[in-house]
Amino acid sequence: EYLCLHIENQINAGADTVQIFDSWAGLIPNEILYDHCYIPNKKIVEFCKEKKAPVICFPRGINKKYLEFAKIVKPNCLNLDYRIDPMWAKENLKNFCLQGGMDPNILFKSENEIFKEVDKYLTIFKDTPYIFNLGHGLLPKTNPDTLKKVIDRVNNFR
């Protein structure tokens, strides 16, 4: 209830998309995942859709339960965590817009290795609704220059 009030205030202040980070979803036991992850997320998604705000859900760590989550919760987009195989996601979540997936640790590797991983995601999801992003947050020592190169790579990808 309070979360929806906060989201409504964000929408009224100009937010045009809402992202729900369910950071602990992967730690919820299977027996209670439906009641303690799917249903609360579904209520928030329904509220956002009533307010005409698209919703991206990030149920971190639920692994191959992403499909079940997506079918029940019905977000506009799913943010993949870095443990999800991108080919599995493309094959099994093909009816959904997807975001993310790349391991943030890749950003500490050589430029060639980074670009290889970026290109992998962009190639796999080339013909599907996909938003390039990481599969988790930036790590504290990530070099901003590396991020600029990644952004340039994404923007210039053909």
Mark where each language-model region is.
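Active-site loop segments of alpha/beta catalytic cores
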Residues: 1-158
